[in-house]
Amino acid sequence: MPGVKVKEAEPFELALKKFKKQCEKAGILSEVRKREHYEKPSIKKKKKAIAARKRALKKQRKMVD
C-alpha cells in the first residue's frame, strides 16, 4: 500500500500529489475499476480474445505500412 511521509514545511497538495502518483504506479485505481462489478469467467475470456485479436490486427497493419 502506498504511503507518503509528510515533512513539516511540505504543503498538503504536494503530499496528495505524491500519494496519487504512488497509487497510479501501484495500479490500485485500475484494480478497483476492474473489481467494481463481478465479471463471469466466460466474459473475461471473450474480452481477452477480442483484445488479442485487436493487437494482432494492429501489428499486421503496422508491418504493412
Swiss-Prot record:
UniProt GO BP: translation
InterPro entries for the chain: Ribosomal_bS21 (IPR001911), Ribosomal_bS21_sf (IPR038380)
GO cellular component: ribonucleoprotein complex; ribosome
Gene3D superfamilies assigned: Ribosomal protein S8
Record GO terms (molecular function): structural constituent of ribosome
Keywords: Ribonucleoprotein, Ribosomal protein
Pfam families: Ribosomal_S21
UniProt-listed HAMAP family: Ribosomal_bS21 (MF_00358)
Listed PANTHER family: MITOCHONDRIAL 28S RIBOSOMAL PROTEIN S21 (PTHR21109), SMALL RIBOSOMAL SUBUNIT PROTEIN BS21 (PTHR21109:SF22)
Protein family (similarity comment): Belongs to the bacterial ribosomal protein bS21 family.
Protein name (record): Small ribosomal subunit protein bS21
Organism: Geotalea uraniireducens (strain Rf4)
Native organism taxonomy: Bacteria, Pseudomonadati, Thermodesulfobacteriota, Desulfuromonadia, Geobacterales
